[in-house]
Amino acid sequence: MIINNNKLAELSSQRVNGLGGLSIHFKDGRSRISRLYQEGAAKIRMPQVGGDPLEAILINTSGGLTGGDRLQWDVELGENASAVITTQACERIYRSGGGEARIATRLKAAKGTRLAWLPQETILFNQSVLSRTLDVELEEGAEILVVEATIFGRLAMGERVDEAMFSDRWRVRLGGRPDGRLVHAEEFRLGPDIGAELQARPVADAACAVATVLLISGEAGKHLEAARQIIGEEGGASLWQVGPATKLMMRLHAPDSYTLRKRLGPLLALLNGKAGLPKVWTF
């Protein structure tokens, strides 16, 4: 038997490329889809809900990402629309054979809108490489709730992350334009010795599960004390006024994903009001 190594190399170099786009407008008393775009591994499904907010579930059909893979989500809300966006499952970032996996999210919200970006956790495996970016453009009067949770190895499965590269970049701007006023920025980087870096108290205090939650809303202040009660000693919450934007910033850490989710779930349910948690979130 003769094996064509060139063909094997071609197959091994195939990469995941996914792009999903969703535009939502408010018409006839409720939020409705005005545009839906799916390409490659990115799929979007809408479960039945009894009214606003519209709920959308993002799916990566590849089952995970590794070096060289690309996944992008674009969500835009028209005036007075509301939506909750989540993922079907945790995103998995596998060992890289070269290059980085990239996840890019772009959110736009017009005035009078409320957008909740609530993906399930991202799980990093040993020797994985991930670059994650989040770009948000808000018109004045728009509200947004954002969470990004990251798990460094599943301890219950005997997995550890000693070496990996992870970067997480956020930019949130007012004015509904890419050059609008910057009201929030994150620039978080770990690696290559992630296992050792996570031990440091200012980083994660030996935690293997972390989450960042951001609420920008005129009513953010009323949730401060309740959020602190839920978060407890393993994390914190702070309130700022940046121009016309009131933002509540929260961080949580835990020894494992289950312990993190036991606090993260109630926190998101509190902050997301009547919409609560997406249906696909389980405990």
Curated annotation (Swiss-Prot):
The keyword Lipid biosynthesis does not apply. Keywords: Chaperone, Cytoplasm, Nickel insertion. GO terms for cellular component: cytoplasm. It is found in: Cytoplasm. GO terms for molecular function: nickel cation binding. Its main location: cytoplasm. It comes from the Bacteria. Transmembrane segments: none annotated. It holds the Pfam family UreD. InterPro entries: UreD. UreD, UreF and UreG form a complex that acts as a GTP-hydrolysis-dependent molecular chaperone, activating the urease apoprotein by helping to assemble the nickel containing metallocenter of UreC. The UreE protein probably delivers the nickel. PANTHER family: UREASE ACCESSORY PROTEIN D. Required for maturation of urease via the functional incorporation of the urease nickel metallocenter. Belongs to the UreD family. This is Urease accessory protein UreD 1. It comes from Brucella anthropi (strain ATCC 49188 / DSM 6882 / CCUG 24695 / JCM 21032 / LMG 3331 / NBRC 15819 / NCTC 12168 / Alc 37) (Ochrobactrum anthropi).
